[in-house]
Amino acid sequence: MNTKVDIDSLPDFDAAQYLGDEATIAAYLTDILQANDAGLLAAALGDIARARGMSSIAESAGITREALYKALRADSAPRFDTVNKVCTALGVRLVVEPIAA
């Protein structure tokens, strides 16, 4: 018997619920960075900021909570200095490594 599931009845997925420790956060960001998509990176940083508490991350980054939400939308292209401030506030850093040939 095939049971059809109404997609609209499924709960929304929220990655922030699964980002409880540094190792998970690092793995998540590493995977996101491989996509080479600024909007996806912004959204991922937003997920992590929500997991850690948006207000405290905004305060640590030196920007308003509203500006942080705006900068970390999936349709945004955040400036590097904003990404860097948010990463510092989150306790992570972006690392450069050679591209394997």
Where are these regions (language model features)?
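Short, basic-rich loop-to-helix N-cap that marks the start of a DNA-contacting helix
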Residues: 75-88
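N-terminal flexible/basic segments that precede or flank functional cores
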Residues: 1-44
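Extended, folded domain segments that form the structural surfaces/walls around functional sites
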Residues: 27-28, 33, 68-70, 78
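Short alpha-helical DNA-recognition segment
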Residues: 50-70
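Alpha-solenoid HEAT/Armadillo repeat architecture
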Residues: 18, 34, 50, 73-76
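Short C-terminal boundary/hinge segments that cap the last helix of small helical domains
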Residues: 91-101
